[in-house]
Amino acid sequence: MKSYVEYIDSNGYKYATDSSGRIANAQGDLQLGEGIRNPYAQRTVGGADRLPTDDGGHLIGKQFNGSGQIDNLVPQNSGINRSGGEWYKMEQNWANALNEGSKVKVDITPNYSGNVARTHSFNVDYWIDGEKFIQIIMNP
């Protein structure tokens, strides 16, 4: 992706890239839906910096109409991304809130070391009906 670009996708989610063209931020008001997966992008995101234990993790989840393209994917440890993991549980919390009629807003910042394409952690600020929550998730 290009460096220092801000864009809004077709679902209203806003993204920004850093000097290396990596996703620096993703934010928006979540909506339930069914995004489309891109298995190739999920298998290859992160390139040489990707670990064998990584998934191509969606910053804005597929169940929220998140894009399946590289504009919304980062190398994410499968232990946090899959069922039972910390990211998975957080997304389930958001989905449950939306199903109950609440409004959910997210502001996700992937954290990188140097010029590597793999994040070491995520700072996630989110609001459910205006109440703010902060979660820091490590990406081992």
Feature map (PLM): residue ranges:
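Domain-level detector of nuclease and nuclease-like folds
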Residues: 5-140
